[in-house]
Amino acid sequence: KKYDTSTPKYEKLLEANYKPAEVNFYLAQNWYMRKKYDVAISHYKKSAILNDKAAYMPTLLLHSAISFEKIKDKDNAKSFYSTLIDLYPSSNEAKVAKQNLTKL
């Protein structure tokens, strides 16, 4: 339930333009955990645009793919799973992506 209380804090940080790539990622994670996948996708996208080399990119790609899957957008889900596998083949996230991709 920390997600409910931390979201406004992250939104204030965004307003102050404080580390916008990271803050968008953490906001996306909050919305993802609350099953608000459309909002999560929006924040993941902003984060990736601002810093596509961040250490959290494998998680961002995996959670984006799962979010697309949850909102029944299989094409984008497949695309994100494939990108994750291509860019981070030895990551734990890529292992999950491979499993999830076979189910689509």
Regions found by a protein language model. Give the residues of each.
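Short solvent-exposed coil/turn linkers within tandem alpha-helical repeat scaffolds
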Residues: 14-21, 50-56, 85-95
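Canonical tetratricopeptide repeat
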Residues: 26, 63, 97-100
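Terminal, low-structured helical/coil segments at or just beyond the last alpha-helical repeat
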Residues: 77-104
